[in-house]
Amino acid sequence: MSKSSKKKKAVIEERYHGPLITHGVSLVYIKLYPWIALALTGFLYVGGTYEDDLGIFKGLSLFCGFVNILGIIISFIPYLVNAWKTLTYCLIALTVLSLVIGIDFIGLLMVISDGSSIGAKEIYQSPLTPFYVILMMFLFIFACGLYAWYYLPKNQGKVWAFNQVKEGDRKKTWWDNFAIAFAGATIIPSLLTGYIQIAFGVLLGILLTLTLPAVMVDAVYAAIYIRKHPDYEELT
């Protein structure tokens, strides 16, 4: 192995990433995430822009659509990805944000739906909408702040126990039991009262709103890191 190869390998191994994700965000994400997010954006546009007098869902659809289409276009041109690595990582972060928006929109529809057709007017008028939106916004901001804390200089380089839980570990057993108890406490009353759809909508929103920001924050950190280490990664 040449000296340059050894040096590059050392640089690749040294990039820090926070908890919850096994490996740091890679440039290859730009080849997959925009397609998934674009599908959800299409659903957001179809389901949310009808009778959208306030224009909130139209604006969100345009933002998400622009980000995802730009990501798809760039993904077909590896030269641009490698030339604009910082921009690509930022684009990945925005793509993940559009994923969160799309998934939370689906969760919102599950919460407020009564089986009839739903448009923006029904969403705005539902008494459950503000509670769901405020909850998801709070969880999103909390998750972003929590994951960003792990990237502070004083915390970098640490190996977090959260990422080291293995099969048979007591901590894993505790987390599994907690997850089962939480799901049971949410779903069982919903089954008994007939509100299972609402429960799944809330669980979907909570689960992904708390986890996807880990990818988004790491993508932002990667965009900062790549400016100091331009040879860190290449898309082939």
Task: Locate the predicted segments by residue.
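Cytosolic-side membrane-entry/anchor segment at the start of a transmembrane helix
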Residues: 66-102, 161-163
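Membrane-water interface of transmembrane alpha-helices
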Residues: 2-3, 67-78, 139-159, 220
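Membrane-helix boundary/juxtamembrane motif in polytopic membrane proteins
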Residues: 128-130, 148-182, 199, 203, ...
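C-terminal transmembrane-bundle signature of multipass membrane proteins
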Residues: 174-236
